Amino acid sequence: MKFEDLKIDQRIEKGLRENGFVSMKEVQQKVIPMALEGHDIIGSSQTGTGKTLAFLVPTLQRLVSLGWGGGDGLGCLVITPTRELALQIFDVLSRIAKYTVLSTGLIMGGLEAEDELLKVNQMNILVCTPGRLLQHLQENPYLSTANVQILILDEADKMIEMGFKEVLEDILEYIPQKKQTLLFSATPKASTARILKLEDPRIISIYKEEGFPSQLRQYFYMMRTGDKINYLHTFIGSNPEVKGIVFFSTCKEVKFHCLLFERLKLRNRIFCLSGGMSQKQRIDVFKRFVKEKNGILFCTDLGSRGLDFPKVDVVIQYDCPCNVETYVHRVGRTARNSERGESYVYLVHGEEKLLTDIQKKGWIKKQEGMEDKGISEEITEGPGVQIRCINNMVKRLVRSSKELNEYCRKYLVTYEKFLTFSSKRYSEGVIRKIPALYEHFGVSRDQSH
């Protein structure tokens, strides 16, 4: 089914066509017709399935059909958990709404609230993060929500996980009861919909627990804690043309490894993205990595939910994820839109339980014809490679650089705290190896505490 088959305004259709959106994906085919009829929607769909257009297209059509314009004020609120996801949604919205008269705006933490003060009430559609939106609702006399027709909550489950439940409840106090609500989550959890108290929502789920994309190859490596840096250096150094994402546990760990790999002077361009960066820095990195054909992004789980980085060849999980769901979200950054992708997870003794847990979830399942294509959904041990040991080189770099030494200590301290407070199912064995990790980097544990 194509977008042109929908009874939508020609200006919206033109914006879609101009940006290469011609055929509808499954979630769009199921959601858009019901949303156009005015139904409330509770949808669950994995990231990368096209749910952004599933809520933006009916929103634009609703407001255009009402003759909405500048004098009508705010007609739609789109609330999403992270600044990067808000930026991504706003980019798509701006492009497909190009030929309509609707004004669009973006408000999010990390930018000056004063700069947004007078602009927000001039917008017909606002994309926002929950904390900044509530701040405007409470403090900005220019923002009126009296005419809001549509409320969209994207990645609603993630907002709850991030502690925004009370913030969302406060926001709802400012929104008219008579409105259309579109709620989307990456996973089908009823708890995320309860706060909205919808009377007769349409439930749409295309969440497929039975398997990963058939074009995804998944590998694991069992190793000693101190060998992780050797494996990562070997992979990056041997693959200068790939576009990849490496997931770490903490912001300080991301920063340290970015500084370290800059000094190792490989041919790959290294990008760094974490919650510890300023908003301007995060936006700049996000935009640059999206445009790059190759390069390696070092990030925390900030980059594992919702963000759509095109043509990512490989995902490396440097640290074992806290649970199977996090593993799934991370590997979901590659093998998107029917393209091939590879995933590697580095495990130390005690963390192999992750593989068992994935098996128990039933998400490891071979599909018909996969063997013929040389692709397997099984998570298998990674192919044998000649690993270059750089431990001594890393020690010398850490000792000779005050900045690197400082961030190495911060990384190790925060990593130990992270393991202490995270799920003990995978981390107990790793915590005992922390002293050895200090030795591998040549820093004193006593001075770090």
Curated annotation (Swiss-Prot):
Task: Report the domain of life of the source organism.
Answer: Eukaryota
State the Gene Ontology BP annotations. rRNA processing
What PROSITE patterns does its record include?
DEAD_ATP_HELICASE, HELICASE_ATP_BIND_1, HELICASE_CTER, Q_MOTIF
Motif, DEAD box: chain positions: 154-157
Q: Where is this motif: Q motif?
A: 1-29
The record's CDD domains line, in alphabetical order, gives: SF2_C_DEAD (cd18787)
Any Pfam family hit:
DEAD
Q: What PANTHER family has UniProt attached to this entry? A: RNA HELICASE
What name goes with this protein?
ATP-dependent RNA helicase DBP4
Origin organism of this chain? Encephalitozoon cuniculi (strain GB-M1) (Microsporidian parasite)
